[in-house]
Amino acid sequence: MNKITYMTIKISIPKYMSRIYHGLFDTGANICICKKKVLPDELWHKTENLVLRGFNDEKHVAEYRADNITIMIAKEKFIIPYIYAMDEMSPDIIIGATFYNKYSPIELDIGKGIIKFTKNNEKYPNYLVKYPKKRKLVPWTKGNPSVTETMENIGINQIESRNPIEEEINQILGTDIYGENPLEKWEKHKTLAKIELKNETDNIYKPPMLYQETDLPEFKMHIEEMIKEGFIEEKTNFEDKKYSSPAFIVNKHSEQKRGKTRMVIDYKDLNKKAKVVKYPIPNKDTLIHRSIQARYYSKFDCKSGFYHIKLEEDSKKYTAFTVPQGYYQWKVLPFGYHNSPSIFQQFMDRIFRPYYDFIIVYIDDILVFSKTIEEHKIHIAKFRDITLANGLIISKKKTELCKEKIDFLGVQIEQGGIELQPHIINKILEKHTKIKNKTELQSILGLLNQIRHFIPHLAQILLPIQKKLKIKDEEIWTWTKEDEEKIKLIQDYSKNLVIKMKYPINKEDMNWIIEVDASNNAYGSCLKYKPKNSKIEYLCRYNSGTFKENEQKYDINRKELIAVYQGLQSYSLFTCEGNKLVRTDNSQVYYWIKNDTNKKSIEFRNIKYLLAKIAVYNFEIQLIDGKTNIIADYLSRYNSSDTDGRYDEANT
């Protein structure tokens, strides 16, 4: 009598993170079969077409076979002699007679949930699965086999299907844009990068590091993988060994979470001595604003972005690095070289610039956006053609198609709204409040920069802390209780942020309101909009800053005037269309802007210069009571001793 049951099995493949599946053990199946994505692509080889008969005698043709696959049940290893690929089945994997014959006899007691193998005469309770799941099948992740990859489950009786529109978009896109090696289609663009030193006679040399024994197999894995892919080569010319940077292994929390270490090269000396590529990286706010009136979004990621670009032959020597196994150099544009982002951005701009009315590119991240489904189909088809024509390789694993809400550049974008991604807040909350050095401070300030438009008066809070970045390396690092309290305060604010900001979609609703205020050492503003025929004012974003040293000597009126200018300038990207109203509670500033004057004092000449800069912007000015200017007042007047609250409302 045939017996079938599901059992937890782990598939372990060298150089890949392991995966756990609920395999169907079927004593009536003649062979082992699985869906093709259950195993890495390179394990499959073409075979003579094998006709498989399934339930109800339906026929399927198997074209691929893999041999000697290691699986684990409990902590014991077993070998599947051979297995065929077949996607037209519900379970991810079926274990059949080729396995049982190797390890027979096998005792299977479904009632007690026990399976027993003669391999070691041991029983394995609790590995039989009562409510099996199947996996969402994605490309395998390279890494340490001792680490198990986290995968999404799909109920075994569920149909794994896309939204019909998403499926249609996927059909338009096709599969030819995807791949694993970014050099696969390099001949289509033949892009080369050049590294130049400021002084050609300079040495770039740092001695090799001391390595832990546990690092050796990690280096071996990374080096073998990158040589195979064509990214690096062994350096045989030792005459120019004046170029050498040390490599090291990073295995921190994020690496442990993804189950794979990183090999990092210390290119500080190279970055100091190389000429700077002065090609700009686009402003994230500018990019996001371009897409905010769209409704449908598809996101793509260039596979191992920088590696699309090869290095000129004379530039390779500058990238030379040492590992325990020897001496190597890059054949492609390396990570860690400070010009790599600019070089790659220039490469991407050259390809996509004519299509920036519906495509956003930030280094290796790409967003296609459209207002309608039909428009999105056209845009996706165009993106496909551009990608194929220029030899770009896209990561299938990171592709998201036809979403009405999507994560991009640290925020969630949807039509008429920007929302802060929760993981950004979590990262801030996880940071220690005791900062040990400038590197740790730069790390948390980089995170806080991502929420600067969501937290009022942030510049004021950070002012004393940011000054510590000017401390020279040889000076003693100090971190006081007051500094610690400021980080704690920001973390407290982060727990209760208004994380979603609304923006107008229609031009008729673009009635912009900018509220400004200033204190002795800081200025602040907030941007709102008021839809047509509505009394509600929706909050869009905050902006704050601190006065320069010479500006701190100004009287409060001139500081308020600077606040007006900074508010108009910082929001100009959003307010270039529609009407603008600036609100201030400073009557002198209101008078200066509202009335033309011909005073000729030296002091007023400076003010007139600032007024001339402000006059570039077309806006109305409104004088309001200081008590009603709550948001802007909070922005600039922060003081931990006189406020324990915050303005949480997103509208008034």
From Swiss-Prot:
Domain of life: Viruses
Listed EC numbers: 3.4.23.-, 2.7.7.49, 3.1.26.4
UniProt xrefs under InterPro entries: DNA/RNA_pol_sf, Pept_A3A, Peptidase_aspartic_dom_sf, Rev_trsase/Diguanyl_cyclase, RT_dom, RT_RNaseH, Viral_Replic_Matur_Polypro
Positions of the Peptidase A2 domain: 21-99
One example GO MF annotation: aspartic-type endopeptidase activity
One GO-annotated biological process of the protein: DNA recombination
Keywords: Aspartyl protease, DNA recombination, DNA-binding, DNA-directed DNA polymerase, Endonuclease, Hydrolase, Magnesium, Metal-binding, Multifunctional enzyme, Nuclease, Nucleotidyltransferase, Protease, RNA-binding, RNA-directed DNA polymerase, Transferase
Signal peptide: none
SS bond partners: none
Active-site residues (renumbered): 26
Keyword Metal-binding tagged: yes
Binding site residues for Mg(2+): 301, 364-365
Catalytic activity: DNA(n) + a 2'-deoxyribonucleoside 5'-triphosphate = DNA(n+1) + diphosphate; Endonucleolytic cleavage to 5'-phosphomonoester
Reverse transcriptase domain boundaries: 231-413
Coiled-coil stretches: none
General function of this protein: Encodes for at least two polypeptides: protease (PR) and reverse transcriptase (RT). The protease processes the polyprotein in cis. Reverse transcriptase is multifunctional enzyme that converts the viral RNA genome into dsDNA in viral cytoplasmic capsids. This enzyme displays a DNA polymerase activity that can copy either DNA or RNA templates, and a ribonuclease H (RNase H) activity that cleaves the RNA strand of RNA-DNA heteroduplexes in a partially processive 3'- to 5'-endonucleasic mode.
Name this protein carries in UniProt: Putative enzymatic polyprotein
Organism: Cassava vein mosaic virus
Lineage: Viruses, Riboviria, Pararnavirae, Artverviricota, Revtraviricetes
